[in-house]
Design a protein with these regions (language model features):
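Glycine-anchored, exposed beta-strand/edge motif detector
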Residues: 2-138
Length: 138
């Protein structure tokens, strides 16, 4: 019956989990590394490295760089899905760091900085992208 059909389907499926990602392409106004948190400059729509210790513009994360790109090159910005990275603790929430393009499991707490949740670690090497708007700390 139905149960056997599900078992048969499971047996024929590949063993690897495939994660769907979605994003968009944009020109980089500075060099970006793979996995860097990015913001879109309001003046021209080009993307660069986001940071929690900058302006509201710089703290508004639009996604993560899928691959490293140089200034003037088009970078694919991942906005939904799973970002392959390293150094994570599974289950921990992650926030935009005060340094350019970085993320941290320790949320910023200094007045004048922005608190920006960007996702949650599903494993030590995968970040589930969950972008939230910045909150100015006072």
């Amino acid at each position: 019956g139905f149960t056997q059909a599900l078992i048969d389907l499971k047996d024929t499926m590949a063993g690897k989990t495939v994660y769907a990602v979605a994003g968009f392409g944009a020109l980089a106004f500075e060099n970006v590394s793979q996995g860097a948190a990015l913001y879109s400059r309001s003046s021209d729509g080009k993307v660069g490295l986001a940071r929690a210790a900058g302006t509201l513009d710089e703290a508004t994360v639009v996604g993560f760089a899928q691959t490293a790109k140089n200034t003037g090159e088009e970078v694919r910005v991942l906005t939904v899905g799973v970002l392959a990275t390293s150094g994570l603790d599974a289950g921990d929430p992650f926030y935009l760091a005060t340094g350019y393009g970085g993320i941290t499991s320790t949320p910023p707490s200094t007045a004048g900085q922005y608190l920006v949740r960007v996702g949650e670690a599903s494993t030590t090497a995968n970040l589930i992208i969950q972008l939230e708007p910045p909150i100015l700390l006072s």
